[in-house]
């Protein structure tokens, strides 16, 4: 049995297979997932696991060069935005698009990880960096 790292086998496989510029989305309960895109549904109940719980684990294991957020998070969920920005390494590019554009961008992600988060616009696309 695995002792360390990401224990969820589906999530671990996605993380292990990431290459430079590959994208993964961490989403809230309400984020629609496009047909044909891999869904890793970790939601157990409203609020659990939280968006921040998943973001912490993801950032511990993946070098991120860019994130994409919905513009609406600035006004509709500023506390969530503040927590996200505090966790980013220096040099990570932050891009804001409309919520509709973010949903459209999910057509090309490697996976959408659904959390139990039940606060508005708690969705992020994370683009992998390169360690060399």
UniProtKB/Swiss-Prot annotation:
Cellular component terms (Gene Ontology): cytosol
Tree of life domain: Bacteria
SUPFAM superfamilies given in the database record: RbsD-like (SSF102546)
Biochemical pathway: Carbohydrate metabolism; D-ribose degradation; D-ribose 5-phosphate from beta-D-ribopyranose: step 1/2
Subunit structure: Homodecamer.
Family, similarity comment: Belongs to the RbsD / FucU family. RbsD subfamily.
Protein name: D-ribose pyranase
């Amino acid at each position: 049995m695995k002792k360390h790292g990401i224990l969820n086998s589906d999530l671990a496989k996605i993380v292990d297979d990431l290459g430079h510029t590959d994208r993964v989305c961490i989403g809230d309960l309400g984020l629609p997932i496009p047909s044909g895109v891999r869904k890793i549904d970790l939601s157990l109940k409203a609020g659990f696991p939280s968006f921040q719980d998943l973001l912490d684990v993801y950032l511990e294991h993946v070098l991120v060069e860019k994130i994409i957020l919905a513009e609406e998070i600035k006004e509709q969920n500023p506390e969530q935005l503040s927590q996200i920005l505090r966790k980013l390494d220096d040099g990570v590019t932050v891009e804001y698009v409309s919520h509709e554009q973010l949903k459209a961008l999910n057509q090309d992600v490697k996976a959408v990880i659904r959390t139990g988060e039940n606060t508005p616009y708690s969705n992020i696309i994370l683009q992998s960096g390169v360690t060399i």
